[in-house]
Amino acid sequence: MKKIDSDLESVLINDGMSEVNWDTLKKYQNTTNISLKELRDDLGLGSWAVRTAFNENYQGVVIQQQPGEGNRKHYYPEADENWVIMDGEFEWWIDGKGTMKVTTGDIVNVKRGTWHQITCISDTPAVRYAINWPDVSHVYEDEDE
């Protein structure tokens, strides 16, 4: 059995992000220009996520996570997703491709319907920029089975 969630706030909370605040998530939504330094100066070095772009075609979310944090294994039925690594290192597992280490400046693409999982493996907080369908459905395996 699979579980489906398309609410960004609950996805982040259920993936282990210690604090998620919807006002913070939307604080920089559709900002013309913002730097990672400005985001970190405002939000700090803890775990956080901000949606910097949102419209009927796509969304962009900057996600900062601590070493060892990541997300649950999941896929998206509606759309592909891609990420730009803004700072640090992540381990990416992609079904059919295996596990890879990605670092600052790398770009990762995952086709819709492909299981994947992400973990921060840096010694310090790492940041990725996720670009996908607005409020995309995340499909998870039911952990109770």
Model-predicted segments: where are they?
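Asparagine-centered strand-capping/turn motif at beta-strand->loop junctions
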Residues: 119-121
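A short hydrophobic beta-strand segment most commonly corresponding to one strand
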Residues: 62, 82, 109, 124-141
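Short strand-connecting beta-turns/loops that link adjacent beta-strands
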Residues: 56-57, 78, 97, 123-124
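A short, N-terminal "cap"/entry segment at the start of jelly-roll beta-barrel domains
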Residues: 1-59, 72-73, 143-145
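Short, conserved beta-strand element in jelly-roll/cupin
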Residues: 63-66, 75-92, 132-134
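Short acidic-glycine-tyrosine-enriched beta hairpin
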Residues: 96-112
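Structural motif
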Residues: 89-91, 115, 125
